[in-house]
From Swiss-Prot:
Organism per entry: Xylella fastidiosa (strain 9a5c)
InterPro entries for this protein: Acyl_CoA_acyltransferase (IPR016181), Leu/Phe-tRNA_Trfase (IPR004616), Leu/Phe-tRNA_Trfase_C (IPR042203), Leu/Phe-tRNA_Trfase_N (IPR042221)
Transmembrane segments annotated in the record for this chain: none
Biological-process GO terms, alphabetical: protein catabolic process
Catalytic activity: N-terminal L-lysyl-[protein] + L-leucyl-tRNA(Leu) = N-terminal L-leucyl-L-lysyl-[protein] + tRNA(Leu) + H(+); N-terminal L-arginyl-[protein] + L-leucyl-tRNA(Leu) = N-terminal L-leucyl-L-arginyl-[protein] + tRNA(Leu) + H(+); L-phenylalanyl-tRNA(Phe) + an N-terminal L-alpha-aminoacyl-[protein] = an N-terminal L-phenylalanyl-L-alpha-aminoacyl-[protein] + tRNA(Phe)
Subcellular localization(s) per the UniProt record: Cytoplasm
Name of the protein in its database record: Leucyl/phenylalanyl-tRNA--protein transferase
Top-level taxon of origin: Bacteria
Length: 243
């Protein structure tokens, strides 16, 4: 067997190598190539692997160790933030503006990054997953204006977060907390947050050994899928209901 990173064939049914074979440096790089078909993307998530690359690069596939994870019942919102929420008139919905959420995530500047990893091909791939009820978004509104959101992929009782954004202070926190509450209510205990940063850790993210994360993924993806009709189940919630 070749040393990592492994070169994937263009055939979408080509299996991924085990995530445990990923490089230590750069942390988690496992494979290069392949494509972004729904079949390939879903196979990646089922094996604890995600795509992350920039314009001009071939698809790069990652499974870092440790893995950053949220428990859906343990999102941390500060006391001050919760106090401010009590007077908030913002509302939260799901799956009503998926394309707008992914576009806003793509256009949001990120510290230490030039450009965006959400390429045109990546965008189209996740729109296809959304059309097949695998990818979902949670959106925060100030009146009719979209001010924050998060999107990712749901398989079984596992949610794989991809990106979030806010144009108003705290809107992405509300999106994350609303997503977590929804998942916890539907017996989905984990949100994959992929790679750590201080902002995520401040919100309650934990660093798990990859082997523990993979064990949870293997168990949770075999459970009954979350309901597909997120927009109906979510309805329109007031953000202050999170307090």
């Amino acid at each position: 067997m070749h040393s990592p990173p492994y070169l994937l064939s263009p055939a979408p049914n080509t299996p991924f190598p085990p995530a445990e074979y990923a490089l230590r440096e750069p942390n988690g790089l496992l494979a290069i190539g392949g494509d972004l078909t729904p079949q390939r993307l879903l196979a990646a998530y089922r094996n604890g692997i995600f795509p992350w690359f920039t314009e001009g690069q071939p698809p790069l596939w990652w499974s870092p160790d440790p893995r950053t994870v949220f428990r859906s019942d343990s999102i941390h919102l500060s006391r001050r933030f919760r106090r401010n929420l009590r007077t908030s008139t913002w509302t939260v919905r799901a799956d009503t503006m998926f394309a707008a959420v992914i576009d806003a995530c793509a256009s949001t500047p990120r510290r230490g990054q030039d450009g965006t990893w959400i390429t045109a091909n990546m965008r189209e791939a996740y729109l296809t997953l959304h059309q097949h009820s695998y990818a979902h978004s949670v959106e925060v509104f100030d009146g009719t204006m979209l001010v924050g959101g998060i999107y990712g992929v749901a398989l079984g009782r596992m949610f794989f977060g991809e990106s979030m954004f806010s144009t108003r202070n705290g809107a992405s926190k509300i999106a994350l907390a609303s997503l977590a509450h929804f998942l916890h209510t539907h017996s989905a205990p984990l949100i994959d947050a992929q790679v750590e940063n201080q902002h995520l850790l401040n919100l309650g993210a934990e660093r798990w050994p990859r082997k523990d994360f993979l064990a949870y993924v293997r168990r949770l993806i075999t459970q009954t899928d979350l309901p597909a009709c997120w927009s109906v189940l979510f309805g329109e919630q007031l953000s202050r209901e999170l307090v």
